[in-house]
Structures are given as structure tokens and as C-alpha cells.
Amino acid sequence: MKTQRIFPGIVLIGFGLYFFLEHSQIEIFPDFYSWPTLLCIVGAAFLIQAYSGNEFESILPGVILLGFGAHFHIVKNLEIWPDNIGIFILIISLGFILRARKTNTGMFHGLILLIISVLFLFYDKITTSFGLVETSTANIERFWPFALMAIGIYFLVRKK
């Protein structure tokens, strides 16, 4: 981090506001005073650092922390919000895509993760739309973890 004052300043302001509201017994929404809120505060600090300090590498951790914190709050309060791994992959892919818009690196990885997250989120609808037979669906479910690992290994060992 080039500018060392923005991130800690935002974190301290956020935590101070969090503890002030907690001690004042002001309830924003149910379960506001829990660890997902702290994730949101740190994630927001990373994003503010990224955009105001022109340190765009902080976009990815900011989106991940803010997104995960928001997810854990939303999943408790909104029944239609999906609670599966697809949401986490979607949040990570959004982080890659937003960072790629500023740094011109990582867009491919973000799009791959976006496709994987959509497959996870809409797997049931996709299989029924294509009319896949139960046995072929079972085979896909059994081998997709290996496909994900193969893609990951490819990213690790490929040379630019």
C-alpha cells in the first residue's frame, strides 16, 4: 500500500462506529452486531483504499470481504437468497472483474469463475432445461470437482 493512512483510518472509523452503535444499543437490523459486519467494514476499507488511493490491487480483497460479509447478513434475513458455494464463487469473480477493469489483468479468470458460479447457482434449472438423463447427471456431479482441480492446476503451471 502506497498511502498508509486511508485503510487504517477507515478501519478505525468503521470499528469505532460499530462499537458506538453497539454500546448505544441502536439496532440497525437483526444480527448487525456480529462478525459479518466486521468483514464488511474491512472490505469497505479495502475498496475505499483501492479507489481513492489508486491502489487497484486492493479491489479483490475488498470485494471478497465486503461480499462475504454481506452474504452472511443477507442469507439470514432474506429467504430467497441462495446459500450455496455458487454465491461465494460469484463474489470472487466480481472481484476479479472489477479489478480487471482498472488493472487490465484477470478478466479471463473472472469470467471463468463467473461461468462456474452461474453453473452452480442454476445447476438444477440447467439440467432440467437440457433434459439430461439421471445417469448422465450423476456422472457430471461425480467428475466436476476433478474438472475444477484440473483448471486450477492449469492456471498454476501454465507459462505466460
Kindly give the residue locations of the regions a language model identified.
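Alpha-helical transmembrane segments and their membrane-interface anchoring/capping motifs
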Residues: 1-160
